Regions:
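Radical SAM/AdoMet-radical enzyme domain recognition
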Residues: 41-63, 71-176, 182
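Canonical Radical SAM [4Fe-4S] cluster-binding loop centered on the CxxxCxxC motif
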Residues: 4-44
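Accessory C-terminal segments flanking Radical SAM cores
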Residues: 192-251
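N-terminal [4Fe-4S]-dependent radical SAM core
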Residues: 1-13, 23-25, 56, 224-239, ...
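Class I S-adenosyl-L-methionine
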Residues: 167-173, 189-198
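A short, flexible beta-alpha/helix-coil linker loop
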Residues: 31-35, 122-124, 190-193
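Conserved G/P- and acidic residue-centered "switch" motifs that form tight phosphate/ATP-binding loops
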Residues: 68
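Glycine-rich beta-alpha junction loops
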Residues: 160-164, 187-192, 242
């Protein structure tokens, strides 16, 4: 399957719910989003039908997102269904990790291959300010549970915010040192409430390199610019939706 720009499409992202158990300041308002009627949410059968159709057109990788996918009841059963579709070579999920300790083992057993977990700070107080209602301990416990369940090279997604977490860049990047995690720093996008934020909140992702040991550039099959700093087994990635247009390379 190709789009009108001639790009081969092999990657499908599916939002399985509009709901989330956090209220991250760069993502949604303090009161969340209006709840959609049940009839407006794709059923598991409909999601399975969509994935089968996509696979028939050449899609090989499927990512489950939200909202927060782990608030969708029976999410492990959905993973099991999708894992059973011939042609799905990789099944991944992006989560805030708040309920990951509860679901990690079941997700692995159901056939989930990869995890991306949002982690914008390692400071509990900052975490509460960023997520409004989240607890850092829940996400860290979720990461521990995911590793015990057998997930490898978990990706950590960190949104860069000047004056908020830029003083933690080196500390967060160091989580990639032993190879258990790969870290991705993402430029803050001026959407929603962020459009009114001070410009100093918006940092170019290249700033990250100033805090890392010198390293080597690593080939990337996606939109992230990947680096392996000296002494690191994992990678540190830069995702630049503002400072570098990457849409032409994205599928």
């Amino acid at each position: 399957m190709k789009d009108r720009y001639g790009r081969t499409i092999k990657y499908l992202r599916l939002s399985v719910t509009d709901l989330c158990n956090c209220r991250c300041v760069y993502c949604m308002g303090e009161n969340g989003v209006p709840r959609l009627p049940h009839s407006a949410i794709l059923s598991f059968e409909e999601i399975e039908e969509i994935v089968r159709a996509a696979v028939s057109l050449g899609v090989t990788k499927v990512r489950l997102t939200g909202g927060e996918p782990l608030v969708r009841r029976g999410i492990d059963e959905l993973v099991r269904r999708l894992r059973g579709i011939e042609g799905v070579e990789e099944l991944a999920m992006t989560t805030n990790g708040a309920r990951l300790a509860e679901y990690a083992e079941a997700l692995k057993e159901a056939g989930l291959d990869r995890l991306n977990v949002s982690l914008d700070t390692l400071d509990p107080e900052k975490f509460r300010r960023i997520t409004r209602i989240g607890e850092l301990r829940d996400t860290l416990d979720g990461l521990d549970a995911a590793r015990r369940a057998g997930f490898e090279r978990i990706k950590l997604n960190t949104v860069l915010m000047g004056g908020v977490n830029d003083d933690e860049i080196a500390e967060i990047a160091a989580l990639a040192k032993d190879g258990a995690f790969d870290v991705r720093f993402i430029e803050l996008m001026p959407i929603g409430e962020c459009t009114d934020w001070d410009r100093r909140r918006f940092l170019p992702a290249e700033r990250v390199l100033e805090y890392l040991p010198k390293g080597e550039r690593v080939p990337s099959g996606g939109v992230a610019e990947l680096w392996r700093p000296a002494g690191f087994r994992g990678t540190v990635g830069l995702i630049r939706p503002l400072s570098q247009r990457f849409c032409a390379d994205c599928d």
